Amino acid sequence: ALPISEAVTMKKLHIIATGGTIACVPSPNGLMPGLGAKELLEYVPGGHKIEYTDLFHMDSSNIQPEEWQQMAKAVIKARESCSGIVITHGTDTMAYTASMLSFMLRDIDIPVVLTGSQYPIVRPDSDGRKNLHNAIIAASELTGGVYIAFGDAVIKGCRAVKTRTTSLNAFESINYPYIGAVANGGFISFVRPEPRKEFSCFIDIDPRVALIKLIPGTSPAFLESVASCGIKGVVVEAFGLGGVHNFRRDHAMSLKKLIDEDIPVVLTSQCLYEASSPDIYEVSHTLRDSGVISAADMTTEAAVTKLMWVLGHTHDMDKVRQMMAWDYCGEINADRVM
């Protein structure tokens, strides 16, 4: 590994370990998270001041809203005595966690950098050693905010998406520039630091949110059934710019029924890049008129977690619409909201 710069060794950091592939060890039933932060740090160069918390040892497929709240609380506690935080985390739900922490820890004044690996750090060829090393560097040199450091890239947390199952460059920055990269033992910034307001922490959420991906022929009855399941908000991955069926199987009318029952519907696209908008085509006119909320250029992960976070504040439909359109942490380009 490359030597760590003087700037890194001067900073006091804190690692919060949550499990994931990076911490996995063999077991009779397959790989399972077993290493804590202290063991993980043995695989990266020394010379830095790092405290650590072993929060839990979980496969990230099991990370749920309760764990997001625990992580946020751990960050708030560690923030009192450090200048940067690294969270080791499984890759499968890392983008959801990074998005939710971006909302919960809005305008945090220190960097919170999530990282993990595609292969366990105990393997000689693991990407975990490089990723953890790079995350430590990033957490030492970034400004406040929530980020993912993976491979050489550093990505804004609420703009990251896992796009590959096994490749080492597993994450991409969607509809937003990469924040920077780690090279030669230092962080290289690609963007100017954003102006920050006073740190605002809000961890109360309503997890009763459903994500529905439309396919040609999706039953309207299925869409309408979410109301009977106690769901309080729906994110719909529609076709292209936001198209839905409006004849034979009328998705638009079914979603309107949900809205009429005070269940907010957020419309996003199955396309990974560029913004969705229900304002372009005739097929979505029913939704436009009924108050569907456009996700604009948000990622699906950001739209889902933001809706949970907004519903933690309010269930008033007008306020939900206003908050979903507001840019809290760089998750949405307000100019793209139709």
Give each language-model segment a name.
Residues 8-77, 253, 257, 273:
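ATP/NTP phosphate-donor binding region
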Residues 241-338:
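C-terminal non-catalytic interaction/assembly regions of soluble proteins
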Residues 11, 16-20, 36-44, 156-241, ...:
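Accessory alpha-helical/coil subdomains and C-terminal extensions
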Residues 1-4:
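Short, small-residue-biased leader/transition segments that mark boundaries at the very start
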Residues 25-29, 98-99, 124-127, 157-162, ...:
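Short acidic, glycine/serine/threonine-rich loops at helix termini
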Residues 114-183:
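Internal gly/pro-rich beta-alpha loop/helix module
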Residues 88-110, 246-254, 283:
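Short Gly/Thr/Asp-enriched flexible loops that form oxyanion-binding sites at enzyme active sites
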Residues 79-84, 229-233:
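Short acidic/histidine-rich motifs immediately flanking catalytic phosphotransfer sites
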